[in-house]
């Protein structure tokens, strides 16, 4: 099954903007499986194929689908991967450092020239094993996105508002804390914004929802080039919309099936979810 942070991110973001992907796959990975992304204006010239096994993550969800239990992480070719950005990638204005070894995230940052907005994600595996490197990445980006459990784990603070303030004190201007089916918060030093999750009766697989959220968020920002507070809030809603599509199917199936009209309708439905100043039927 096609997976990986970059895969979900690219499938989501490509609905809004061309994407340049950087990563590595093993010799066991049929490269033609990536054709579905290439057809969506995703430049794969930064994806290397190396001898060895592809990265693999194994996990399970119990009653609470907001929490993934990691059963196994096999780095494979990622263990020796050193990202080398094509020269044509180095002028990228909007950079998202997906969930990989934070040392590799730092290497990517060292190769891009002057990004307008750099954002990063991480996970419990890296927080446990390379916390100092995770903090080094956070100190260099404009925005960090992570889920509520990761925010608590990284900061040692149970209160999410306090955790967000702690993260803001360590470098980024914006912190997004995702709470799965309960929505997402965006914090700055001056403001707090909340977007609900889309209410779904049927959910197939929550894997990749966070990366799809990031793709929707960064894709919208790259499309508009607008870093105003209002547009960042709209980007959170677009991220939530894309995440809601991702969980409606397995792998990136739904992200490939949908079109602009589907996205517009869902964003409108998000607006209706939080509208309280219009007249309602008696």
Language model: regions and residue ranges:
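Conserved N-terminal subdomain of the carbohydrate kinase-like
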Residues: 15-97, 109-115, 264-282
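A short acidic, amphipathic alpha-helical/loop segment
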Residues: 33, 104-111, 132-136
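Alpha-helix C-terminal capping segments
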Residues: 9-19, 220-222
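Conserved phosphate/ATP/ADP-binding segment of small-molecule kinases
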Residues: 114-117, 124-194
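Short catalytic helix/loop segments, enriched in acidic residues and glycine
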Residues: 1-11
């Amino acid at each position: 099954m096609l997976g990986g942070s970059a895969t979900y991110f690219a499938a989501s973001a490509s609905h809004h903007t061309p994407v340049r992907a950087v990563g590595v796959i093993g010799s066991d990975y049929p490269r033609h499986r990536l054709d579905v992304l290439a057809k969506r204006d995703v430049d794969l010239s930064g994806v290397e194929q190396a001898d060895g096994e592809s990265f693999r993550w194994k996990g399970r969800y119990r009653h609470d689908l907001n929490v993934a239990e990691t059963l196994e992480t096999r780095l494979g070719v990622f263990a020796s991967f050193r990202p080398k950005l094509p020269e044509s990638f180095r002028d990228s204005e909007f950079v998202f450092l997906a969930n990989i070894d934070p040392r590799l995230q730092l290497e990517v940052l060292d190769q891009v020239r002057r990004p307008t907005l750099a954002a990063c994600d991480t996970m419990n595996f890296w927080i446990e094993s390379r916390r100092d490197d995770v903090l080094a990445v956070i100190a260099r980006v404009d925005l960090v996105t992570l889920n509520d459990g990761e925010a608590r784990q990284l900061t040692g603070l149970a209160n999410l508002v306090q955790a967000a303030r702690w993260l803001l004190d360590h470098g980024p201007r914006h912190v997004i804390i995702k709470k799965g089916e309960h929505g997402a918060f965006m914090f700055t030093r001056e403001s707090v914004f909340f977007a609900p999750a889309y209410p779904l009766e049927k959910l197939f697989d929550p894997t990749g929802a966070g990366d799809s959220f990031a793709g929707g968020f960064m894709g919208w920002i790259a499309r508009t080039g607008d870093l105003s507070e209002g547009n960042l809030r709209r980007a959170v809603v677009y991220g939530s919309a894309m995440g809601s599509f991702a969980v409606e199917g397995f792998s990136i199936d739904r992200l490939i099936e949908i079109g602009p009209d589907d996205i517009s309708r869902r964003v409108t439905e998000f607006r209706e979810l939080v509208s309280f100043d219009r007249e309602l039927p008696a």
